[in-house]
Amino acid sequence: MDNSNTAIYIRVKGQRPKGFVDPLPFEWNLEKEKRLWSIISTLDSNRQQINWKLLSETIEVPEYFLKERSYTLFSNNLQKLGKFIDNNNTSNDPSKVIPGTSQTGDYSNLKALDVSKGSMDGKDMCQDMKEINDPNYVDYDVDNEDETAELTLQKLQTSKILTQQNPMKIRSKERKEEFQETSDADLWSSLSVSTSALEEALMDRMHI
């Protein structure tokens, strides 16, 4: 018992209200408080009701005091629970953790990773060693596109890709030659027919 949870009644002079009864003296100790808390803290749902009259008779404490004391116990425990939650959230918040320490407060040796610009160059990291060792490998440089295009053209010419004849041109040439041969044959055929006809006509005219 202390000043924060002890009710003090002061008797003053004057007429008592009608039906007023002096509260009976009672004893309140830690054992009774634990017993009260064990009962009110184990309620399963709002449907369960406390029989304050029976509880008052069992603990031998006035009913009004049990209700007030129950409210005080719940209030104190809720405050403790709120502080516990606040402390737990603070310890688990990464923004509130001291740099160089873990969330549990243990210090760890953190080494800074020094990454230079050259070590993270994607060109150096992505090049294949087989391509670099290839004599026909051409390194593409964005800053010198003309030189790169010229080198690429030279590589294509040396690899005989551009020197090969176009298959479409070859087919067109073959078709043209076939058409020319066919035209010549038809012409000679028609000439031979005309010559034969002229010979027959001359023979008839000459009555041979």
Curated annotation (Swiss-Prot):
MF-aspect GO terms: SNARE binding
GO cellular component entries: Atg1/ULK1 kinase complex; phagophore assembly site
Any one GO BP annotation for this protein: protein transport
Domain of life: Eukaryota
Cysteines joined through disulfide linkages: none
Primary localisation category: other
Protein keywords: Autophagy, Protein transport, Transport
UniProt xrefs under Pfam families: ATG29_N
InterPro entries: ATG29, Atg29_N, ATG29_sf
Coiled coil: none
Subcellular location: Preautophagosomal structure
Chaperone is among the record's keywords: no
Function noted in UniProt: Plays a role in autophagy. Functions at the preautophagosomal structure (PAS) in order to form normal autophagosomes under starvation conditions. Also plays a role in mitophagy and regulation of filamentous growth.
UniProt similarity note: Belongs to the ATG29 family.
UniProt-listed PANTHER family: AUTOPHAGY-RELATED PROTEIN 29 (PTHR40012:SF1)
Protein name from the UniProt record: Autophagy-related protein 29
Organism: Vanderwaltozyma polyspora (strain ATCC 22028 / DSM 70294 / BCRC 21397 / CBS 2163 / NBRC 10782 / NRRL Y-8283 / UCD 57-17)
